[in-house]
Amino acid sequence: MKIQDYTKQMVDEKSFIDMAYTLLNDKGETMNLYDIIDEFRALGDYEYEEIETRVVQFYTDLNTDGRFLNVGENLWGLRDWYSVDDIEEKIAPTIQKFDVLDADDEEDQNLKLLGEDEMDDDDDIPAQTDDQEELNDPEDEQVEEEINHSDIVIEEDEDELDEDEEDFEDEEDFKA
């Protein structure tokens, strides 16, 4: 059955990934992702909001389903259309080539190398602003000196002691 013969009910019931396979098989050529989605919208008479969640799932399925191949520029085709050599060529990462610098290039003052930061941009930023505190604040040392550790008393709550004793007694009951 051709994709154009689908009814709205069939479009509602069928997954977008299966419809995309049928559509690409019918057309026999690669299609842009957005054109595929527009085709589905027209078939099912959908608004964008109505199929938004289905489109998200469709894109995930399109990337994971082995029947499809992204041939670049958001163009999708069927993997069956391509030989193994074609697939490797289409999906192989491209390597960006750089020129090797010679002695003359290294002396060029106007040449900017990759990874070099422009130091001039940071000249107007002060090392410390007025609203920042210094790490070695003398007031902090004064506070530490004012605390006498021998004056600190830790009071134990009697209720907590009673509960601990009860827990200990309960454990002895289990051993007996």
Curated annotation (Swiss-Prot):
Residue ranges, compositional bias (Acidic residues): 116-145, 153-176
Sorted UniProt keywords: DNA-directed RNA polymerase, Nucleotidyltransferase, Transcription, Transferase
GO MF entry, a single one: DNA-directed RNA polymerase activity
A GO BP entry: DNA-templated transcription
Highest taxon, organism lineage: Bacteria
Region of interest (Disordered), ranges: 114-176
Signal peptide: none
Gene3D superfamilies according to UniProt: RNA polymerase, subunit delta, N-terminal domain (1.10.10.1250)
Keyword Cell membrane: no
InterPro entries membership: Asxl_HARE-HTH (IPR007759), RNAP_delta_N_dom_sf (IPR038087), RpoE (IPR029757)
Transmembrane spans: none
Domain HTH HARE-type: start-end pairs: 14-81
GO cellular component assignments: DNA-directed RNA polymerase complex
Subunit text: RNAP is composed of a core of 2 alpha, a beta and a beta' subunits. The core is associated with a delta subunit and one of several sigma factors.
Similarity comment text for this entry: Belongs to the RpoE family.
Function summary: Participates in both the initiation and recycling phases of transcription. In the presence of the delta subunit, RNAP displays an increased specificity of transcription, a decreased affinity for nucleic acids, and an increased efficiency of RNA synthesis because of enhanced recycling.
Name of the featured protein: Probable DNA-directed RNA polymerase subunit delta
